[in-house]
């Protein structure tokens, strides 16, 4: 207390205040990751392991589970290939070209992220279902889209297409066109320029987009549930198997398959991030 009788509150130095604020932000981030990411994963892992190794092995050997993993793999592979090709093309158009409607195209790219997957599935039903816009043509040619693999692939591609685009566009904007113009000046064709210059510059963005696409494709359930019919042993993906397992109170097999899917996605993302950081360190040295 001062001589005048006023109570003075001690003021922390600015550096100390910054450290406290910084530490608080770190604590909040760790709490967020721990509660919303790590804790659920630990819970699933604990539930799966608690079922016993015999249950884990027997679950992973079930024909329905094996077919579900196979179908998930097929959908994921096709989705990755298609979204990578068209994603890079769209990213090049958005990053390099100037035309009327470019802003609208850039906004529409994010539409699959804003629309519920269930709505995406219903859109597919409107287009390819009984009485749908395109159903008569496909039916007349003996092609089945709805409640079959094609519709499952289509909705998954629609949902996953933004990931490659949004990872590649910033990279293209950052690197610019100087190297590409230099390659053309030296006589390189458009294809040579793309494969030797452009693709080399965007490879890490593309790989990370592919990793996100893979993880999203593996975990997709809403749209696939609508268009697949969830026929066991035919149109049931791994995530749909998990849903059916819990609906039928078969919790242990559901936890085992769920943990397997989670581990695949986590390992893939960690590997991509590790290689990316190693490459960045090599470039700096």
Q: What are these model-derived regions, one by one?
A:
Residues 2-3, 7, 24-28, 169-184, ...:
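C-terminal transmembrane helix and the adjacent membrane-cytosol boundary/short C-terminal tail
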Residues 8-21, 44-81, 93-97, 244-252:
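Periplasmic/extracellular loop-to-transmembrane helix junction in inner-membrane transport proteins
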Residues 11, 16-17, 56, 78-109, ...:
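Transmembrane-helix boundary motif in ABC transporter permease subunits
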Residues 9-15, 53-61, 66, 101, ...:
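Membrane-interfacial helix termini and adjacent extracytoplasmic/periplasmic loops
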Residues 35, 70, 74-86, 90, ...:
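Hydrophobic alpha-helical transmembrane segments of multipass integral membrane proteins
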Residues 19, 56, 60-63, 224-270:
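Interhelical loop and adjacent transmembrane-helix boundary motif
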Residues 114-121:
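Transmembrane alpha-helices and adjacent helix-loop boundaries
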Residues 27-32, 81, 111, 158-176, ...:
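Transmembrane alpha-helices
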